[in-house]
Amino acid sequence: MQRCSVVAALAGVVFLAQACSLSTPSRITHTDKLPVVVTFNALKELTQMVGGEKIHLVSIVPDGVDSHDFEPKAKHMAFISDAKVIVYNGLGMEPWIHSVLHAARNSGSIRVEAAQGIVPLKAHTRGHTAHHVHAHASHGSAYDPHVWLSVCNAQTMLRTIGKALCKADPQHTRFYKRNARNAAARLEALYKEYRSKFAALSHRYFVTTHAAFGYLCRDFDLQQKSIKDVFNTEEPSIKRLVELVEFSKKHSVRTIFSERGPSEKVARVLAQEIGASVETIYTMEKNEENLSYYERMKHNINRIYRACSKQVTPSQ
């Protein structure tokens, strides 16, 4: 994406938003519920857990569009201008967000960086050129943005979102606090269940197409081997594929994890080479098979555990 295109378009977008403000049926001001805008699916799910029926929730990044590459249109600016609470991930996941927030001129809104309070992991930039790495770093992407894929981080995010909703809508404070507490407790139970299961394994590594699961690895002391790095932007080199084939054969890897989409093709090539199967893993950046956040998180953890439990000690 050409980053300057977002900035260049903002003036026109704001003009269009103002011009359409009286006629656009998708404005969210005319509701008794608290108007909340989030950037993408995982944040929508987490915010809905807390807000329930008390909020009117809009997610602005469409399914199938990468949050990094999203370019806001007039209707998105209108939503942001109307919102009382705006939830975004941070850590460079939405490099356009601060320009958009400034252009929206909604100074009365509560703006929530969901990654706040989470210790970030540095992004591994294997295979990137110095120019490419610098470009990511200049947009705040020196760190891995995929904080929502951690069952522990998600609990922090729920509390952060809950505090914002309570501040924006104090009359429903008890409702938001209870929902945040219950959702976090459910995730904590999932964490405790699999923490003991993973601890009993001798081998805790898995192979995936996209290095998006560093925070989940931190939860359970796992190690991910990936075809592409955290930015998921460059095609893997032959050298990298050979390394993964050798690693997978040495450690009896029988599962290659992949998001649905173009990544599945290279995953199948690697799986065929080592005699493994390909299993779906969810990144939760978009709606995936109409599964909830909790269902996808449990799926990911369970499938990784099953894959790790099949591994054997490599022969010397």
UniProtKB/Swiss-Prot annotation:
Q: Name one GO molecular function term.
A: metal ion binding
Instruction: Write out the GO biological process terms.
Output: cell adhesion; metal ion transport
Q: Which domain of life is it from?
A: Bacteria
Q: Where are the transmembrane segments?
A: none
The residues the record assigns to binding a divalent metal cation are: 68, 146, 210
What Gene Ontology cellular component terms go with this record?
periplasmic space
Q: Where in the cell is it found?
A: Periplasm
| Alphabetically ordered keywords of this record | Metal-binding, Periplasm, Signal, Transport
Could you confirm whether the keyword Metal-binding appears in this record? yes
Q: Sorted alphabetically, which Pfam families does this protein's record hold?
A: ZnuA
The signal peptide, as residue positions, is 1-19
Q: What does this protein do?
A: Part of an ATP-binding cassette (ABC) transport system involved in metal import. Binds a metal with high affinity and specificity and delivers it to the membrane permease for translocation into the cytoplasm.
Tell me which family the UniProt entry assigns to this protein. Answer: Belongs to the bacterial solute-binding protein 9 family.
Name this protein carries in UniProt: Putative metal-binding protein TP_0034
